[in-house]
Amino acid sequence: VTVSKDAAGRWFVSLLVEEEISPLPPVAENVGIDAGITALATLSTGEKIVNPGHERRDRRKLAKAQRALARKAKGSANRAKARARVAKVYARIADRRRDHLHKVTTRLVR
């Protein structure tokens, strides 16, 4: 058992278990993936996977939290709270990005 806490103040517990993993049945068709800038990816079938819309809103929220942090006096309690707020926004961005990529890759595999 491993217990850890991240910068955003969230606690995580990790357990090690043994489990048999059944492989997925093979998919008949192959698909090429081209990572892009305007679209997250373009498949060889012509399908485009769009970037998540929440990314821009989250970046604005992060910029606002960072500006608030920059105005705080070093060593103050308010600065510590502002740092925690920035860490929380970063964690939310990372979580949402990871969730989106997991959903996209799962859809491609199945």
Go through the PLM ranges and name each one.
Residues 3-110:
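Substrate-contacting helices/loops that form the catalytic groove of nucleic-acid
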